[in-house]
């Protein structure tokens, strides 16, 4: 959602990612499923300007009792103008509504952002957007409240023929990862990828997430912090299949009192290993 529609769009694509279901807070062992449907239309007024309208619907549903399931509807409109071959500006407006299963406590967010993107060289590009975000929420026992905060996104990308680097930051309203009824999330992340050969590829990634509960102004928020690193190696199998192996290491700092009765993610370092096999109807390029 919310991408620049100018020629920079290929590398400048992190604007507006907050209005999607996210899980930057780890839970204890629990079964869940998450799905997102996205759509986008664009109308070009000229070679240098365009209007983009996008929408999304996402669900985060826990089959393990005790966590907060949610579904989100969001939309974003943006006008993008290419100043020259290297610089673009955009005006973005976003809206999201999050409903939580079993409660009558929806959360809504309205954001307006100014965005700037620059193609520094043929391989290096940068983008940033920022603006006010108003969140409104209703909570049993406390009634409704409104907060005004900052929404922001930025990304730096570097791409070569066989390698690439992405460093990004985002801040804004999120669903709460099944632990909070709404949260303000700050996420820093970086990914480095490389194509070793026609068949083998790999990547490493890392980041930091800081999440705080959505509460009225003046009330102390509950917070989680999460550090994570990972690595992935993949191999193409023929023209239609890919096999990948991955490893993750993370550490989460929990609040003194866990917000959900079923318990929070274990403190200290946690490791994960996995393998995936993907098959595509179309031949893999």
Explain the meaning of each model-derived region:
Residues 1, 51-53, 89-91, 126-128, ...:
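Transmembrane beta-strands of outer-membrane beta-barrel proteins
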Residues 1-3, 57-61, 95-99, 108, ...:
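Transmembrane beta-strands of outer-membrane beta-barrel pores
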Residues 17-25, 59-63, 96-100, 135-139, ...:
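Extracytoplasmic loops and strand-loop junctions of Gram-negative outer membrane beta-barrel proteins
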Residues 33-39, 73-77, 89, 93, ...:
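Hydrophobic, lipid-facing positions within transmembrane beta-strands of outer-membrane proteins
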Residues 46-48, 82-86, 119-123, 160-163, ...:
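Outer-membrane beta-barrel channels and translocator barrels
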Residues 233, 240-242, 246, 268-285:
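Outer-membrane beta-barrel "beta-signal"
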């Amino acid at each position: 959602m919310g991408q620049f529609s100018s020629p920079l769009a290929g590398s400048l694509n992190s604007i507006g990612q907050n209005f999607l279901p996210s899980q930057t807070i780890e839970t204890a062992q629990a079964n869940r499923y998450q799905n997102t449907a996205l759509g986008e239309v664009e109308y070009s007024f000229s070679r240098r300007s365009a209007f983009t309208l996008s929408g999304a619907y996402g669900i985060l549903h826990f089959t393990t009792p005790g966590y907060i399931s949610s579904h989100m509807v969001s939309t974003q409109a943006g006008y993008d103008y290419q100043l020259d071959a290297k610089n673009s500006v955009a005006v973005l407006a976003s809206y999201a509504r999050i409903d939580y299963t079993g409660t009558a406590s929806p959360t809504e967010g309205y954001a307006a952002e100014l965005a700037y993107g620059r193609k520094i060289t043929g391989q290096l590009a940068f983008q940033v957007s920022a603006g006010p975000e108003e969140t409104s929420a209703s909570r049993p026992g406390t009634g409704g409240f409104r907060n005004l905060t900052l929404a922001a996104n930025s990304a730096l990308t570097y791409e070569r023929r066989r390698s690439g680097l992405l460093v990004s930051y985002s801040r804004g309203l999120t669903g709460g990862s099944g632990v909070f009824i709404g949260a303000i999330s700050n996420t820093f992340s970086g990914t480095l990828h490389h194509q070793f050969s026609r068949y083998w590829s790999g990547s490493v990634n890392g980041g930091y997430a800081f999440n705080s509960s959505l509460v009225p102004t003046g009330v102390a928020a509950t917070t989680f912090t999460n550090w994570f690193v990972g690595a992935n190696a993949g191999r193409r199998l023929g023209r239609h299949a890919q096999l990948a192996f991955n490893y993750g290491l993370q550490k989460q700092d929990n609040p003194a009192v866990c917000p959900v009765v079923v318990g929070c993610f274990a403190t200290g370092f946690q490791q994960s290993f996995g393998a995936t096999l993907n098959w595509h109807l179309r031949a893999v390029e």
